[in-house]
């Protein structure tokens, strides 16, 4: 397995798909990286030369990936919570942030139901 920016990418998959295993690199970014380096998208990772892997690593190091990107996202969420914005409050309460209805659904974010017992009549 080749190691690019601290992530072991699978050998038997196409390069364009393998690069998406890196956090912060999606399909369009992977395609543009390979296009700038003139590497075919259809080639397998095991068929890459050491020089090609080194070039891909250098090109990907220009992007924010893995730890830097995760840290930036968590700091952005923390900042929203500190300034007390609406989005920050929704993050703090563990509710949907982007305007989704939460009256009936939103179970994924809210977690399992908390049932309340009825009083006997």
Swiss-Prot record:
Disulfide bonds: none annotated. GO terms for biological process: translation. Residues 110-121 have a biased composition (Basic residues). Residues 92-121 are annotated as: Disordered. The keyword rRNA-binding applies. One of its GO terms (cellular component) is cytosol. Keywords: Ribonucleoprotein, Ribosomal protein, RNA-binding, rRNA-binding, tRNA-binding. GO terms for molecular function: rRNA binding; structural constituent of ribosome; tRNA binding. It comes from the Bacteria. HAMAP family: Ribosomal_uS13. Located at the top of the head of the 30S subunit, it contacts several helices of the 16S rRNA. In the 70S ribosome it contacts the 23S rRNA (bridge B1a) and protein L5 of the 50S subunit (bridge B1b), connecting the 2 subunits; these bridges are implicated in subunit movement. Contacts the tRNAs in the A and P-sites. Belongs to the universal ribosomal protein uS13 family. Part of the 30S ribosomal subunit. Forms a loose heterodimer with protein S19. Forms two bridges to the 50S subunit in the 70S ribosome. This is Small ribosomal subunit protein uS13. It comes from Mycoplasma mycoides subsp. mycoides SC (strain CCUG 32753 / NCTC 10114 / PG1). The gene is rpsM.
